[in-house]
Amino acid sequence: MDAMATATQAGDAQAAFAGTLTDKLKEQFDAGLLSGQELRPDFTIAQPLDRYTDTDHAVWAKLYDRQASMLRGRVCDEFLQGLSTLGMGRDRVPSFEQLNETLMRATGWQVVAVPGLVPDAVFFEHLANRRFPASWWMRKPEQLDYLQEPDCFHDVFGHVPLLINPVFANYMEAYGKGGLKAASLGALDMLARLYWYTVEFGLIRTPEGLRIYGAGILSSQGESIYSLDSASPNRIGFDVRRIMRTRYRIDTFQKTYFVIDSFDQLFDATRPDFAPLYDELRAQPTLGAGDVGQSDLVLQRGSREGWADSDDV
């Protein structure tokens, strides 16, 4: 293929990310990783194992050790079981292909490598077909505690172990199918809130107390402590209508965490047709991330200490 054709293909691939072209994606295009030959129509790429540096593996090991040492007694048993079943090691960034050998046998899911955030429709299509799109690249050593977009550690360590659990795996598939429908109904904002407050920042009630299952918490040292120990945030019982009305924070720890009783409760919430629910909720005002209502099942009303004054998403 001549240079002009290659450049045209790369330009077409870059244009496909319109609206989601982050700095990390631009970096990969500039490096030639995402030429038209590399990027598939579903926005996946072959995981470039040969591009991981010693620094990448060291960052993975440091994050893995840090989180694994503090999560026992904080994270739900289902996550620990999934981590053990997958045999996800600490020494190196894992091979997605090797993870998939176990994951496919367990629940029919697989991890697919993507260069970063992908368009909504692509994301939902992957989930609906039991494919979890995971960023292949690792954060830099100076980004251990804060990263603007999800990297491989967040996506793989934070999300993938729970896909071993059949009920949670079913929920994720149902969410993907629901997302495809929500897009056609103009309701992505409401469905995004459900993902945020469950898959990313959810807590679960167990006989031993509250435990973490949300990947955004699991992959963060600070929020792993804050979400369970701090008096600042609200902790409110799960209510799908309430969640779909509630704005959230992307720049600080959460003001509110929603608590499920079980993964069955979470999956059952996705069974009804959401179309009438979207119509109902459009007629109601959205709620701030820290709001507490009279009908809420309040497990703990937050002290509000340290809350940011900026607007919620």
What are these language model-derived features?
Residues K177, K181-A215, S219-G222:
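Extended, Lys/Arg-enriched charged tracts that mediate electrostatic binding to polyanionic substrates
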Residues A113-V118, N170-M172, G186-A187, G209:
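Short coil/turn segments at secondary-structure boundaries
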Residues E97, D151, A169, E173, ...:
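Non-catalytic, well-ordered alpha-helical scaffold segments
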